[in-house]
Amino acid sequence: ICTAYDMPHHGIFGKLDDVKRIRDAAPNTHLMSAAPEKSYATADEAVRAAYKLLSIGCDSFYTNNSSSIIRSLRKEKVPVISHVGLIPGHVNWIGGFRAIGKNAKEAIEVLEHALELDDAGAIGLEVEVVPPKVAEIITKKVKLLTISMGSGSGCDGQYLFSQDILGYNTGHVPRH
């Protein structure tokens, strides 16, 4: 899976050329992308954003929105990849960047969230900065593809940033 992720500083239209270039360079690779965070508030807006990305070559649409929006996307046959654990857009709600699921209450909440997204019809799930044992349990309990981002090797796949792989990261190196 190759990701052309949301780049709020470019907006969705600045990213469309990137999606097209990635698709041209990797025609047989699953390509996932997202609309910029908070660029859609309703299910109809999410479907519109997803169709725009699918129309230029994406294979699936990433969203960390609610299961109701995911259900609406799936009703319209949009393949959805969602997110549990540390969700960067929610860091101010949880006291900053930190591992999620280190205590029993949070671990159960992360698992329940994963099961809810699975039930909503997501085809994949990014599991970010969750203890490896919790990520393994999630992977065993859900039907969808799990992708670890700093959550150990117990998921179906590993999410890596090109900046990290190529050594472009300066300063603090995140856990993922």
Regions found by a protein language model. Give the residues of each.
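Generic beta-sheet signal
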Residues: 34, 80-83, 147-150
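Conserved anion-binding
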Residues: 30, 38-120, 155-156
